[in-house]
Curated annotation (Swiss-Prot):
Primary location group: secreted
Enzyme class: hydrolase
Name assigned to this protein: Probable mannan endo-1,4-beta-mannosidase A
Organism listed in the record: Neosartorya fischeri (strain ATCC 1020 / DSM 3700 / CBS 544.65 / FGSC A1164 / JCM 1740 / NRRL 181 / WB 181) (Aspergillus fischerianus)
Classification of source organism: Eukaryota, Fungi, Dikarya, Ascomycota, Pezizomycotina
Reactions accelerated catalytically: Random hydrolysis of (1->4)-beta-D-mannosidic linkages in mannans, galactomannans and glucomannans
């Protein structure tokens, strides 16, 4: 078949335009800001560890409908649910570890529940941060691997080759399900990875090799660590969170080329600091991200009471700090078919006065600052 020059040129132009349109679907980081659906700037969101464990699709849809209505753009979810023994019928789990073997549950009470979360989010334009393992024992965590593979020390998770092979098999299984989904904001290595008492080289090498592995599987989506932001010299006051006690070096880890943006959390009540201290914590991480040329995401923050008075100053500081391009409060709450979603004291329920100050007023401030009103 013969093609004229104009026909070929038109085809090539069309392909370039299609590629550009496709690229717009996927969230990205550029300099110190995030871009979502063609908009570059600062974005608000929340956390919901439980949404992937719901068994009623209508409940999942309800959450994303309310998020969209409220202007929340990013939801961080647990992409893991590890067990050492198979639970009773009707209980969702994603992977079972026992006797040196890990088996991924791709059934209706397994990753198909996460499938629906991704599907529902995609329909409503909500972006997801999907996490692969927990530092803590909630929903199995690293210790579920450690126990099944004959280790006793939590930190063996990072060094035991059999554990890391199992972890990577799981990462590949999840990533391969959603490689083409624009609903994925980023893949996240772990929730709050720590290696207490370790040389920072241990976490650094694990983060580097794991993020490189994920990028080989999926070049379209961003990758982040999910750390708390520990181990930072810049603007340090010498308090516990700035130290390297937990084996993390924020600045060095952020510089890894296959890490697209920085993450940091804030829990003054757990860390032995004041609530006011949190403003400096956000500013120091913004400065570190600015120096690295990558955006920071204020990924978790919360208190168990007096939410509006204590958390809104952190939101204002974050919004006005160069280098920080979004924040996700911990955690989202809603009224589901079975009643209220889990409440750990930090939960902000949709439709309440607290939701207005933490979410609606904050989203309005973001839009006003960026001219998105």
């Amino acid at each position: 078949m013969k093609f004229s020059f104009l026909t070929v040129a038109s085809f090539l132009i069309g392909q370039v335009a299609l590629a550009a349109l496709s690229a717009k679907k996927f969230a990205s980081a550029s300099d110190l800001q995030f871009t979502i659906d063609g908009k570059t700037g600062y974005f608000a969101g929340s956390n919901s560890y439980w949404i992937g464990f719901l068994t009623n699709n209508a409940d999942v849809d309800l959450v994303f409908d309310h998020m969209k209505e409220s202007g929340l753009k990013i939801l961080r979810v647990w992409g893991f649910n590890d067990v050492n023994t198979v639970p009773g019928q009707g209980t969702v789990y994603y992977q079972v570890h026992a006797n040196g073997k890990s088996t991924i549950n791709t059934g209706a009470d397994g990753l198909q529940r996460l499938d629906y979360v991704v599907h529902s989010a995609e329909k409503r334009g909500i972006k997801l941060i999907i996490n692969f393992v927990n530092n803590w024992d909630d929903y199995g965590g690293m210790n579920a691997y450690v126990k099944a593979y004959g280790e006793t020390d939590h930190n063996a998770f990072y060094s035991n080759k059999n554990i890391q092979n199992a972890y990577r098999r799981y990462v590949k299984a999840v990533v391969s399900r959603y490689t083409n989904s624009p609903a994925v904001f980023a893949w996240e290595l772990a929730n709050e990875p720590r290696c207490k008492g370790c040389d920072t080289e241990v976490l650094y090498e694990w983060i580097k090799s794991t993020s490189e592995y994920i990028k080989k599987l999926d070049k379209r989506h961003m990758v982040c660590i999910g750390d708390e932001g520990f181990g930072l010299d810049l603007l340090s006051d010498g308090s516990y969170p700035y130290t390297y006690v937990e084996g993390s070096n924020f600045t060095r880890n952020l510089a890894i080329p296959t890490i697209d943006f920085g993450t940091f959390h804030l829990y003054p009540d757990s860390w032995g600091t004041t609530h006011e201290w949190g403003n400096g914590w956000a500013q120091s991480h913004g400065a570190a991200c600015k120096a690295a040329g990558k955006p920071c995401l204020f990924e978790e923050y919360g208190v168990t009471s007096n939410h509006c008075a204590l958390e809104t100053p952190w939101q204002k500081t974050s919004l006005n700090t160069t280098g920080v391009s979004g924040d996700l409060y911990w955690q989202y709450g809603d009224t589901l078919s079975t009643g209220q979603s889990p409440n750990d004291g930090n939960t902000i329920y949709y439709g309440t006065d607290e939701f207005k100050c933490i979410v609606k007023d904050h989203v309005a401030a973001i839009k006003a600052k960026q001219g998105w009103v």
